[in-house]
């Protein structure tokens, strides 16, 4: 199965025309945090930095680590979202936060008790979780929860008490159980692509989360094919999660180059407050604040992970079809727009 999967991914990369990561080894840890980031935190703690010590105490006492639950929430055989009376995905996102925060605490303090907790969570899901379930909302699980488990595993990958065999099994579990759901959404979108003859049925956060998951998984598993697959959907793909702007995008109602609902950043407003004179409005902007902020967050998580691999996706997005100089600072212009929300 894995061989067929990678052949499929490689064909997508060829169609896209761009390979964002070559066969060179990935840097580890190299997702949301690099080793240099952890070293900087440890140095501030060692120097007795007041703010760093306060932050450490806040992390130690955070609910996912201690609080009312000094143990894992229930690990479900099938993580479910979207069907009333059957939802249990809340357990997964709480446990993902627990694993991630405990991984952080182990990494900056060296205290193995935290490392043991993080590994216990990751192993429990690898052993007991068999799949993701629900209605169409199942497609939100990889991008809003799965990447957090991956970041925890990326931090813990060199933990001496996590056997190499268990780490390899965890990576395969993420491919077999989680990646298949992410891939299915990106390529079929619950059959809306075929039924509606376009890629725009879902708001951008759906695709952003699944692409973020793929970028993260590719780094964790040292698989450039999966990393490139995720970056393709963000930088060249046809969906609302994509930064790609082409002449094929419709100009709906005269509202900018793309119009509402087509592309991650459809509008570019001349404004001196923005980088190079533009504030860039995202596709989720105009909805509630949670959705609007999540769009920038998910994109930033993916691009920060890419940045830590030497792929500066923040700055290599110039597109001649975008008005003025806005295309040279697409993400920065969007960040300034969202910050004014």
Language model regions located:
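Basic/polar N-terminal segments that are highly enriched at the extreme N-terminus
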Residues: 1, 18-24
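Bacterial N-terminal signal peptides that target proteins for export
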Residues: 1-8
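Bacterial N-terminal signal peptides
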Residues: 8-17
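Extracellular glycan-targeting catalytic surfaces
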Residues: 22-196, 200, 208, 212, ...
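Short, contiguous, pocket-lining structural segments
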Residues: 141, 170, 198-209, 218-222, ...
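Long, repeat-rich segments with strong aromatic
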Residues: 219-341
């Amino acid at each position: 199965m894995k061989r067929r999967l990678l052949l499929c991914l490689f064909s997508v990369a060829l169609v896209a025309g761009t390979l964002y990561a070559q066969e060179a080894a990935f840097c580890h840890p190299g997702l949301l945090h690099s080793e240099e980031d952890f070293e900087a935190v440890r140095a501030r703690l060692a120097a007795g930095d007041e703010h760093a010590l306060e932050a450490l105490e806040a992390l130690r006492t955070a609910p996912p680590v201690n609080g009312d639950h000094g143990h894992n929430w229930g690990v479900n055989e099938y993580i479910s979202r979207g069907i009333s009376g059957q939802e249990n995905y809340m357990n997964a996102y709480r446990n993902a936060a627990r694993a991630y925060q405990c991984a952080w605490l182990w990494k900056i303090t060296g205290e193995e008790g935290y490392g043991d907790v993080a590994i216990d969570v990751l192993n429990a899901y690898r052993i007991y979780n068999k799949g993701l379930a629900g209605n169409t909302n199942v497609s939100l699980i990889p991008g809003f929860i799965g990447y957090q488990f991956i970041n925890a595993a990326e931090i813990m990958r060199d933990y001496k008490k996590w056997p190499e065999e268990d780490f390899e099994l965890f990576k395969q579990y993420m491919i077999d159980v989680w990646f298949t759901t992410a891939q299915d959404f990106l390529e079929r979108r619950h059959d809306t692509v075929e039924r509606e003859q376009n890629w725009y049925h879902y708001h951008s956060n759906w695709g952003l989360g699944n692409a973020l998951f793929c970028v993260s998984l590719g780094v964790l598993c040292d698989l450039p094919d999966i990393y490139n697959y995720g970056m393709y959907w963000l930088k060249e793909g046809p969906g609302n999660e994509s930064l790609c702007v082409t002449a094929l995008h419709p100009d709906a109602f005269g509202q900018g180059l793309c119009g509402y609902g087509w592309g991650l950043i459809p509008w570019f407003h001349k404004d001196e407050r923005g980088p190079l004179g533009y504030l860039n409005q995202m596709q989720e902007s105009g909805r509630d604040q949670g959705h609007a902020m999540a769009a920038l967050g998910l994109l930033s998580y993916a691009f920060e992970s890419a940045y830590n691999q030497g792929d500066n996706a923040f700055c290599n997005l110039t597109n001649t079809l975008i008005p003025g100089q806005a295309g040279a600072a697409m993400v920065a212009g969007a960040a300034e727009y969202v910050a004014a929300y």
